[in-house]
Amino acid sequence: MVHPLHVAVAEELQHRLAGRGELIKDPACGGTQYLPLFVGDIKRRDTRMCDVDLLIVLGGRVMVIVEIEESGFLPTKICGKFLQSAIATHFIHDSRPESALPYGKCVLFVQVLDGSKCLKPGTQKDKQGRLIEEKIRSILPLKGSSITDYRMFFVQGVDDLAGLESVGAAVSYALA
């Protein structure tokens, strides 16, 4: 099932890549495959950590991981997806010619949240999100993990061009 914000983020990143690297999309982003991350280079059920929404591969290595949340803001979900991705070391999928794609030396993890759905008046979710981003960035890199940077963006739906551009700019900067 395709999700509007997922597609908008994928389109922004595809535009920013402009032929540099490969954007791999899950079905919610308009792709055709799930994007499983594993610990190690052998595909097994016990080493599968999670599926993510978008990956950017450059030079045969995963350089950017993107997770998009359209349904709400739960700190356990936000932190859990980040930690599972940080524990993982490879993207493995049968559709790839490589048996496994390792993470690069410096990987950016991006979380995009639909602010139009999770930033309701009277809540402190925006402050909580900034605190989570600040705290995660302060502990990076985690020992044994290639994720060296973390960014969180609240995008106010598919029409928030400035928000989408911020996501694209952060990814472009990380790949420069």
Model-based region annotation:
Residues 140-163:
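Charged, structured surface patches that assemble and position nucleic-acid processing machinery
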Residues 36-41, 67-74:
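Surface-exposed cleft-lining segments at the edges of enzyme active sites
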Residues 54-56, 64-70:
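Conserved catalytic cores of phosphodiester-cleaving nucleases, focusing on short active-site segments
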Residues 62-65, 108:
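Structural motif
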Residues 158-175:
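C-terminal helix of von Willebrand factor
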Residues 1-10, 14:
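Nuclease catalytic cores
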Residues 22-60:
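Active-site metal-binding core of divalent-cation-utilizing nuclease and nuclease-like domains
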Residues 70-135:
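Catalytic cores of nucleic-acid endonucleases
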